Amino acid sequence: MNDNQMLRVLVTGASGFLGGNILRALRINPRIRPIAACRDSRKISRWFSGDVREGDLIDPQYRRELSKDVDVICHAGTWASMWNHAEIERTHFLAPTCDLIDAAIRNGVRRFIFANTVAIAAKVKDGRPIDDFAPKQHTGYWPHLDRLIDVDDYMHANSTRGMQMVNLRLGHFIGVGNRLGIVPALTPRLRTYLVPWLAGGRKHLPLVADSDLGQAFMRACVAEGLDNYESFNICGTEFPTLREVVSFIAAETGFPKPLYSVPYPAGYAFGWLMETLNPLLPGSPFLTRSIVHLCEDWVCPNDYATRKLGYLPGKDWRSAIREHLADLKAQGYPWPRLCQVV
């Protein structure tokens, strides 16, 4: 984006954890005029004084109008569940997102930046690094992840229609305000003494902190020399093991560390059982296959994003988790629903 005009950047999901951190990063760049999009403008952070386009992304008319007079879209407004809900994932996430892309192309948007995950890549067993364009693999058991892959495929297929497509393969979120992810899912479960190590906790997690997420989107908005389709790993400064992360959470909270270890196939089998029994039990499943999937080996270097976007993560994962845990403690370490409200 190399002209001298103010860049009009629309952020969907602006009232959420990711959208809020994107807005926070955009507002410090004098070249950018951020525009917030969300269902309820009252939930947007009070410090934001820019334009707000209120509406629901499942409304076709709202989608058609949303991207008018916009240069860049940061799409963080996605519906998500950690298990099942295949039909809702199609109607509330996949179809609206693809339609939003089409509307943005018609309205002359120049760049579409999508919040994806490193976990769309095919799993590796030897811990080798996973690059930014690594082949993807549908799981067959986690509808949301599979639809994320479908959106990425749709972006790639439509990247020659005049709007650049930027797929950000984000690491696992950590930071104040996050309620659907690995830390809020694991923390209250540790209190039960029922959480095991997975294969001794030796695999590596791709954590990424709140401020680094915002930085990545801001840099993706203004970067020059991008191809029609781009994919970038966006992770933190290092890749701690599952054992390091869980041990840190236990030390900070006083909750017990796991007392035993199980292999990954056993974790997936127990997750399947809990998902299957969920209709008969209250609340969300104790364990889902998606949680096990997120605890696989995800060493996804940032080198390409550093080279083309100038992205350099700066927040240590321990500091981000410490802040995250303080936020969860203030709420009584709530048991997460693992599914957003429809």
Spell out what each predicted region is.
Residues D126-F173, N178:
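Catalytic helix-loop patch of NAD(P)-dependent Rossmann-fold dehydrogenases
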Residues I88-D99, N107, D146-R147, V208:
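Glycine-rich NAD(P)-binding loop of the Rossmann-fold in SDR/ketoreductase-type enzymes
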Residues R219-F286, N302, K308, W317-R318, ...:
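Mid/C-terminal beta-alpha module of Rossmann-like enzyme folds, strongest
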Residues C98-L145:
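Conserved Rossmann-fold NAD(P)-dependent oxidoreductase catalytic core, especially the SDR/UDP-sugar
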Residues R42, R46-A95, A103:
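NAD(P)H-binding glycine-rich loop region in Rossmannoid oxidoreductase-like domains
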Residues N158-L205, D210-S211, I249:
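NAD(P)-dependent short-chain dehydrogenase/reductase
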Residues M6-N29:
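N-terminal Rossmann NAD(P)H-binding glycine-rich loop of SDR-like oxidoreductase domains
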